[in-house]
Every structure is written in C-alpha cells, then in structure tokens.
Curated annotation (Swiss-Prot):
Statement: the UniProt record of this protein carries the keyword Hydrolase: yes
Residues the record marks as active site: H193, D257, S353
Residue ranges occupied by any Peptidase S1 domain in the UniProt entry: 148-400
Organism of derivation: Anopheles gambiae (African malaria mosquito)
Modification after translation, per record: Proteolytic cleavage is necessary for activation.
Residues covered by the Clip domain: 30-85
Keyword RNA-binding found: no
Entry's Gene Ontology molecular function annotations: serine-type endopeptidase activity
Regulation of catalytic or functional activity: Inhibited by serpin SRPN2.
Residues making up the signal peptide according to the UniProt record: 1-26
Any one GO biological process: innate immune response
Disruption phenotype: RNAi-mediated knockdown in female does not affect lifespan and basal melanization. Simultaneous RNAi-mediated knockdown of SRPN2 and CLIPB9 in female, reduces the spontaneous melanization and the lifespan shortening occurring in SRPN2 RNAi-mediated knockdown.
Keyword annotations of the record: Disulfide bond, Glycoprotein, Hydrolase, Immunity, Innate immunity, Protease, Secreted, Serine protease, Signal, Zymogen
Name of the featured protein: CLIP domain-containing serine protease B9
Length: 401
C-alpha cells in the first residue's frame, strides 16, 4: 500500500467518521448497513471488506456518504472508529438510490450532466439543466472537516471549494490576493472588487485561479495525524477564459459586489477539489445570531497573511443595526448584503476578499461573499458580505457549458 493510499485511508478513518470515545464493551453488536444488510458493529480495522474498499482510491461523494452512514456506536479502544461490517464479509456496494433510508439525501454519481429528481421542476430550473451540482444528491458542499482573523487552521481537505486568485504586476511578479469559491467544473464565484478597479492598479492583472491549496509555502501539502503523514494532491492552477462582473457594480462602491470567473479548463474533482452548493429552492437564509463559517488565507493575529488555510465561525449580525453602524461611515447596507461577525479579533479581512461565507444545512452552502468592512476584527463592527441568494438569477443566466 502506497504512502498516499495509507494517508487517504487514515484520513478517511480519522476524519470522515465521528469518533466515539467511551468505556463500554458491547463488542460485536448487531447492526444494519446503509445497504440494509445485517452486520456487526466492530472496529474498522477488523472489517477488511470496508477498510480494503476505501484504501483503494480517492473517495467519491457517494463513498464518503456511505462511510459516514456505516458508523455505529460500538465499544472503542483509544481512537478506533466503529463501523457496521457486513456479516458475509463482502465488499459493500455504495449506497444506490433505492436503498437510501427515507429522509436522507440520495447519492448518484456526480457530473456536469446531473439532473434534478423527476417531478421537481423548480429544482431542475435552479440547476440550469445540470450545470450546477445538486445539493440533494451530495454533489456539492461535502467537506471532511468542519482567513481569518482570530481563526484557526483548517483541515487539509476542509472546504475544498476555496479558490485563490493570482495576479501579475507589470514586473511579471505574481502573488495571491483574493479568494473565491468553486461552484462547478468551470466557474468560480468571487467579489467584483477582486477582478476590476483598484485591485488591477494595486495587484496587477488577474491571471489564474489555484484550487486545492492548503499551505502556500510548500509544493506538496502534508500534515501529520496520529504519527501518520497525510498529503494532498498537488494544487490545480487554472487559467481564466473570461470574467463576468455584475452590471450594477461600480469601482469603489460596494453594491452588487459579485463576479463569475469562467475557467479555461474543466476541473476534475478530487478529495481536495470539490464545488460548494449554491442556495437553491429549499435553502433557508440565516437568521441573526446563527453561526456561519468563513475560510481563506488572509490576515491572522500572528501574521499579515496566513500561509495555511484558515477557518472561523462568526455569527450573523442584526441587519438593521448593521445599517445603522455603517450609516455613520456614509456607507449604505442594502437587502442584498448580509452582515456577520462583530467580535473582537474575529473577522474576515484583506486577503479573504471574495472568499466564502458558508452555512451548513446538511451540506455546505455559499451564503455570502466577503465584500468589505470597517477595518478588521473590531468589536461590534461586523463585516459585510454580498448575499448570494439575492443573485442566483444572475448567476444562472451567466453560466454555460
């Protein structure tokens, strides 16, 4: 077994599964597998049929979901996860749609031609004929783990839709500045101020997008878990075929701060590069006080810019109060914007511009795009985000095969 496969297997075992730490000794309890076979609840290290299956490849969304559903609550020893192991020892068939328990999302192979369930015309329209991944089929928003000013390091394959925008100045020097979110194989959603206006004068021309990055200081990103080295695939650098800026955006203003980047190539999904879900018909917008997450490579308490992907949970801020706060700065907050944060030293800023504000609703949805704020991490001064649900019609009308 190669070092990489060992890494994938360990990552699968230690991160995808919730680990049950306890002292009971209910060894080999009977259980039912996700495909409704009788099995025994045992350590995954004793279940060759599951362990061998998941050591062989980079996991698809369906395989990730199957492994999660195979988890059971048996006895534990240290940090060993327990799974429902088929009684006949055969390799599992991964969760066909007809065997998924009622009330859970079905899982079918992901791909650009995926369509909505029959009879759901509204969702079919929202998916633009399959150009957007379907949240109901776990085709997006699947993150193994759970810039961030006051944040912490993300897991190596957490938030795999995060994109880094690269710019080139007149001297030919390149640097990363803004962020973005991969929404399908050809498009990244970001902030308009990251692609036109002052950013061009300050950073240079936008030339490429990097996907699957974890540590900008290393060529191959690796972390150590339980004395086992886990390494990511090399990041993907994609050229930009075209830039689509919302027609309402004006340089140095903040309204309609949203843009689409059409990549010059179709992106192949891996465990480290996947799309985030867009808010569709059944998405419930966040209320004041709810916790959403931001991720990126921006400023931290220790550094002007983080080399390692960061994450931070922040609360949605009362909209009316946010309008009042920013009115004192001669800045108008519209209903197409969302405010979040406002705790000291916990904010998204600088290098996080254009990056995602995410809401977990079974899968991860892109609810906001980092737009602007009043400095970084100030007490009772929330950041302002472009509210993505308000722009879904624009997004749908501007993507193509």
């Amino acid at each position: 077994m190669t070092s990489y496969n060992r890494s994938v297997a360990w990552l699968t075992v230690c991160v995808l599964l919730a680990l049950h730490i306890g002292g009971s000794h209910q060894q080999q309890q009977q259980c039912t597998t996700p495909t409704r076979l009788r099995g025994r609840c045992i350590s995954i290290y004793e279940c060759d049929s599951i362990l061998d299956y998941f050591k062989q490849r980079i996991l698809t969304w369906e395989e990730r979901e199957f492994l999660r559903k195979s988890q059971c609550t048996g006895a534990t020893s240290g940090r060993q996860p327990f799974v429902c192991c088929p009684g006949n020892g055969s390799k599992p068939v991964v969760a066909p749609a007809t065997t998924v328990p009622a009330g859970t999302a079905s899982t079918t192979p992901a791909g650009p031609a995926a369509t909505a369930p029959s009879g759901d015309a509204a969702l079919a329209d929202q998916l633009v004929g399959g150009l957007l991944p379907n949240p109901k089929k776990n085709e997006c928003g699947v993150s193994i783990g759970m810039r961030i000013y006051g944040g912490q390091n993300a897991d190596i394959d957490e938030f795999p839709w995060l994109a880094l925008l690269q710019y080139e100045n007149r001297k030919g020097e390149r640097k990363y500045s803004c962020g973005g979110s991969l929404i399908n194989r050809r498009y990244v959603l970001t902030a308009a101020h990251c692609v036109i206006g002052e950013v061009e004068r300050k950073e240079g021309k936008l030339v490429s997008v990097r996907l699957g990055e974890y540590n900008t200081k290393t060529e191959i990103d690796c972390v150590t878990e339980e004395q086992e080295e886990i390494c990511a695939d090399p990041p993907i650098d994609a050229g930009i075929e075209s830039v689509i800026v919302h027609p309402g955006y004006q340089d140095m203003a903040h309204a309609d701060d949203i843009a689409l980047l059409r990549l010059a190539q179709s992106i192949e999904y891996t465990s480290f590069v996947q799309p985030v879900c867009l808010p569709l018909t059944d998405f419930r917008a966040s209320k004041t006080g709810e916790v959403n997450f931001v991720t990126g490579f921006g400023r931290t308490l220790q550094e002007s810019r983080s080399a390692v992907k960061q994450k931070l949970g922040i609360k949605v801020y009362d909209h009316a109060r946010c309008q009042e706060k920013y009115a004192t700065k001669n800045s108008s907050i519209t209903t197409n914007q969302l405010c979040a944060g406002g705790e000291y030293a916990k904010d998204s800023c600088h290098g996080d511009s254009g990056g995602p504000l995410m809401k977990l609703q079974k899968v991860w949805y892109l609810e906001g795009i980092v737009s602007y704020g009043n400095r970084c991490g100030l007490e009772d001064w929330p950041g302002v985000y472009t509210h993505v649900p308000a722009y879904m019609a624009w997004v749908r009308s501007n993507i193509k095969e």
